[in-house]
């Protein structure tokens, strides 16, 4: 008697099609294309989990740079002054302070300027 793999194959294909739910066009209907797209989306997700950290750091640096240049200090001098004045605030917190509490950021900047001279 031969072994019929119909239910097993259907289950395996439904598993991949469930993962491809919401994709556009044949990528959510056709088994082969759906499987390829799911695997590709996993590679994109893996890559982008690494890249999101870079993107946020660039954003924080751009915000800090804009806030410091408004006061006449470049970003690199500001970071150098932070290290000299032994202020240990990370870039994320500095950018949040620069946006939401500009007076506090100005106080930090004046302290940094005093250590630069």
Curated annotation (Swiss-Prot):
Organism domain of life: Bacteria
A Pfam cross-reference name: Ribosomal_L20
Record-level Gene Ontology MF annotations: rRNA binding; structural constituent of ribosome
Keywords for this protein: Ribonucleoprotein, Ribosomal protein, RNA-binding, rRNA-binding
Gene Ontology biological-process entries: ribosomal large subunit assembly; translation
GO terms under cellular component: ribonucleoprotein complex; ribosome
Membership in a protein family: Belongs to the bacterial ribosomal protein bL20 family.
Function: Binds directly to 23S ribosomal RNA and is necessary for the in vitro assembly process of the 50S ribosomal subunit. It is not involved in the protein synthesizing functions of that subunit.
Protein name (Swiss-Prot/TrEMBL): Large ribosomal subunit protein bL20
């Amino acid at each position: 008697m031969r072994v019929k793999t119909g239910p097993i194959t259907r289950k395996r294909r439904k598993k991949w099609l469930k993962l491809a739910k919401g994709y556009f066009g044949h990528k959510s209907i056709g088994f082969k294309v759906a499987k390829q797209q799911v695997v590709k989306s996993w590679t994109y997700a893996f890559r982008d989990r690494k890249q999101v950290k870079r993107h946020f750091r660039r954003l924080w640096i751009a915000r800090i740079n804009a806030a410091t240049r408004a006061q006449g200090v470049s970003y690199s001098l500001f970071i150098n002054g932070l290290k000299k004045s032994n202020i240990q605030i990370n870039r994320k917190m500095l950018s949040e302070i620069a946006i939401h509490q500009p007076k506090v950021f100005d106080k930090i900047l004046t302290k940094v300027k005093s250590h630069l001279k």
